[in-house]
Amino acid sequence: MGIHGLTKLIADKAPGAIKEHKMDSYFGRKIAVDASMSIYQFLIAVRQGEQGQLTNEAGEVTSHITGMLYRTIRMMEAGIKPAFVFDGKAPTLKGGELAKRKERKAVAEAELTRLQESGEGTAEDIERQQKRLVRASREQSEDVKKLLTLMGVPVVDAPCEAEATCAKLAEAGLVFGTGTEDADALTFGTPKLIKNLNASEAQKKPIVEIDLARALEGLELTMAQFVDLCILMGCDYSDTIKGIGPVKGLELIKKHMNMEGVLAEVKKMGPKYEIPEAFPYEQARALFVTPEVVDCSTVDLKWTEPDAAGLLQYLVHEKQFDEARVKKAIERLQKCKGKNSQNRLESFFGPVTVRASEKKAVAAACRESCPDSAAASSCHSSLVALALLRTHALGPGPLCALGRSLPRSGAGQRRPG
């Protein structure tokens, strides 16, 4: 479920925290992906028309395997190094949310039966109810783990919530950010939230990146206040306070500094604002601030050669996939290996933030000394040139020599960074 309305609130109040990118902008990036969320998305999205989810001849659902195979290859073709993190046990405090999901599933089942028996429902109505019934099973998670291992992609088993472990891997510097649609990864502390990684090419959705530090700056909150705001807005661990939405919640947190101050004020505000009888905000806060996660010092993320024979055996002989298609997928996967062995230049020079004054200075120096405009452009746009300029105080001559040695635009080469 995530946090009710959080992405919209950040977009409205801290728009500088949200950027849109193409997938290949993450070339060389390691991203921790919420596997459980991905499986759920594939079970819903990968379908065969009115017949529902993809199945093999034995009637086994294969939507999750098909989706994970091709979306992961697509990420790797863009140079991304995905590491998939799987949910462990659900926190006890999440029991209320899980019970609500069970109730919603029962309602959807009853409505689907009614539509099918009465003949009143359109194909769209029936598909909508079918999607509401989708739940990822433990067996489907094991299917995907086996697939990813054969693909040479690292798998991490979280002791509890996958988003929490993803966030801690990012905080520890083992990955760049968290790939999920659930905004509560920000509440768990991921520096970067990356959305739409699993969107199909046909949807043409850009990758949406939310920067936590910029969100906090734009919202004018500390991390502790941000966590309290997320609980106030509604999360998996507690209900909301009637009458308080995202904007009102932000206003109250900024005015009263924390949840305790907000609750004291709400009690004076009259019957319009109703605090739930059970509102375990302290326990919810603890789950966000000190979640149960893997010990990052023991995590060793490695991307290895795909096991072509193992993939053929698993997908073709065990899961009854088309052999020709599987062989083509393996060829694509093998071609990704070269890309995924490359690193971003900042892994050598450190992260580079380009200051406007530096950008102008480098560009001016290159234009002055480079008669070749293409070389000058390559020179001043290069992170290498900027890093060398800072580190060694190079003049325009060495910079332009470097610029001429770099690939020209239009030559089919990837720009550094």
Predicted segment positions?
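Serine residues within intrinsically disordered or low-complexity segments
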Residues: 369, 373, 377-382, 405, ...
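Non-catalytic nucleic-acid-binding/docking modules located in mid-to-C-terminal regions
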Residues: 13-27, 209-372, 378
